[in-house]
Amino acid sequence: MHLLPVITAVALIYTPLASAVPSSSNPQFPAALLTESNSAALPTQEWHSPRLWTRLRNSIIETIWRVPSQQRHPSRIKSPASSRKAPASIRARYGDDVVLRFTIQSQSDIQALVEASNILFLDIWASTDEWVDIRLAKDVVPSLLGLLPSSLKAASVPVIHDLAQAVYESYPQPSSSTPNPHRAFSPSIRLSSEAQNIFFQDYQPLSVMTPWMRLLASMFSTHVSLISLGTSYEGRDITAFRIGTHPMNPDNPFGQRKTIIITGGSHAREWISVSTVNYVAYSLITGYGKSKAITKLIEEFDWVLVPTMNPDGYVYTWETDRLWRKNRQENNLQFCPGVDLDRTWGFEWDGTDSRSNPCSEDFAGDGPFGGTEAQRISQWARNQTMNNNVTFIGFLDLHSYSQQILYPYSYSCNNIPPTLENLEELAIGISRAIRRTDNEHYDVSSACQGSVNSGKKKQGPALKRMESAGGSALDWFYHDLHVRYAYQLKLRDKGSYGFLLPRSNIIPTGKEVYNAVLEFGKFLLGKEAPSVDWDAEFQVSDPSRPISPDNEYHDRDVEHEALQQLDDEDGEADSHWVLRTQRS
């Protein structure tokens, strides 16, 4: 039986299609977004020209920071031609915004970008040990460059030339409703080549996703239940799958339950994280009883999968602003709502610098657990451990983008996690599993830092990561809830599309994380893992490509680690993939 098409079809039948739209006041199916003539159906809100503010800001910057006025010529970044033009309502919201990538070489480069971004209230999209992506309007580019040292002025390239057009093209298209029979299917069930994953052919709004989750839970009630971790600021349920052999019985006779929690959608605009959690959930649910590996994992562990920890923000990205990041709660500034749900957790909460500004993208709230959803989820987790005989042993927090696997701590590089070696070992295994899927490379490092590489030579010590901060879910689950294996996975891509990842990446990214979850579970099983042929369960995006043996990658890793040791000793060796950590 082709389960997913049936589930999706029923979910769609019982869900008014109008609710899947980008406008709560003018409900239409998303296809209405796709033509210029229907541009009125696109997300709209009152919009005021920023020109006066831009001129005032530029004047202040020019006076205080002595930016030469001749630098204020309009940016010459050109937009690529497109046969489908973004309508006026999208242009009104995103204007002439672009995304620039800066190559960083030193800690001073990072500090300069942080300070300039805070001054100009810019949106930092992503950062790694080699680059930083920043969103800004074209006419702000000269102001930014004027605040940066000479080393950075020539170190930037446009990643997205026309953000408004990119946003427009990221919404579901009419063609996406026609399934492609050649698309990949569930990694946990070997269906026929004609199987079609309708649900994963495109991103889904909450109004479609929630009925789909309910239907899936009702069809597999022997090992699945739908639970609420609390309610959001606007009153929506924070819904999750609980998967296990006895999820409906909190007083089970089998003793304490080891539980793994996988979350997505903390930042509303990171749609790929939401789809990926759903993909992994579907694979686990439908694989039980058919896949030996999945059956073993569900019998040994309980799994809690939360597609979106930020349902209000997620809905807002569909109805109003595709690039909204925070939740939607009110704060002291009515015109700057929202709290960054990955900066508001209680452990080492930090409300200084830009995190104290309600208009900042990383506003941490007025205090620890100032974000409603983070507070509710933490209360649920505490209650599970204290009253429901649950021990959380694993935490995977999915984000985008930049293809990284990060482990604690995020708040500081000065304190080393007591289980560092185990965290590193499993992180390397996860990266290896992802690489076996489709040769995509995910870097591994501490969440607080990276290392700078130039060419083939190691250049200097590890750097503090630009995005590192206190109050992260990663640190709270690891330190306060004592989850031994806690990670943040930053999914595809490495910046070509950023948060606007095309729908064609949904299934490949889902497969990568599915294989990562297999590796995660295999590692936690320990001595019991050899009883299952894990290689038989691994999937690749290209079925014609044979799966490389796990030991092949292990041998490569050993070789690279040996090379890095030589590099540390005499500075001559080169390592392409090395885990660098700061141990003091």
Curated annotation (Swiss-Prot):
Residues 202-524 form the Peptidase M14 domain. Residues 564-584 are annotated as: Disordered. Zn(2+) binds at H267, E270, H399. This is Inactive metallocarboxypeptidase ECM14. The keyword Zinc-finger does not apply. Residues 1-20 form the signal peptide. Coiled coil: none annotated. It comes from Uncinocarpus reesii (strain UAMH 1704).
